[in-house]
Amino acid sequence: MNVASISLAPLEPAAQAAAASPTMGAALAALGLSLAPLVQAVLFRLQPRRRVFFARWGFSHVLGAVLAASVTYLLGEALLPDSAPFDGPLRGLLLPQLAMLGALGVALWSARLKQPEGWRALGFPKNTRGDHAGENGRSALLALGALAGSLPLIVGVSFLWPAVLEFLGAGGDAGAITAWPELTGSALVTAYVLAVVVAPLLEETFFRGFLQPLFVQNFSEVGGVLLVALLFASIHGAGPFLPVFIVGLMLGAIKLKTQRVWPCALAHGLYNALVLGLASA
């Protein structure tokens, strides 16, 4: 089982969609692409202002975060018992989140060192306009709208991607969701909490809160969102790569419009919950 692909286990509909019709996938993907301008227009009305944030940390801090993630991952490998309930899919969920904690430790240190606002620079700004409820409501609606508008494209690509991998002769890990029936009781509850709450918050804080501002500054808004989405998808392996890449683009767009991490984590967590619910049905 590919441990990296389990760090976003619920965002792997490709494994469940392998037997679905590529024709249906193409139709859904085409529908999703045709809806994109409408979705963009609606989201622009929700959040018309262009928000700019300047990150003072650099790529040396990113390298430090990667090294810290490697260390905490290896420590988890060595220290977590290789027996129930820490074996199997739960282990595959825990280890990547330990790596995320290591990376976020460096990200928090970098923000406190370089930014006047400290840790809030990672996508948790204070609301200075006074309209807290209105601002939060618009951000939540934007996240929900982006998720709903992106679902046809994501699901369509999920149907198509296994056929592409098969054509290329490349294998993908299909075990992330299919191994979940092995979990019962507290292990199953822990796995759901990790997948729907913990992983979205940690991963969005690192990828969209820490990496994306730096990449946007150096490679433009479009280039930065694309590159971070590629990195985001690459850690999950070939099996779910393209669907997760599309999800990463959606989450990057949410962060770009709101400059907040919690709407990204909201969309991420809801999507994970949706896919898990469908897989369990």
What residue spans do the PLM features occupy?
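N-terminal, membrane-interfacial amphipathic/helix-forming hydrophobic leader that caps
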Residues: 1-123, 127-141, 273-281
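Transmembrane helix-loop-helix hairpins at the membrane interface
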Residues: 13, 26-40, 148-160, 164-281
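Juxtamembrane helix-loop-helix connectors linking adjacent transmembrane helices
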Residues: 78-98, 110-199, 217
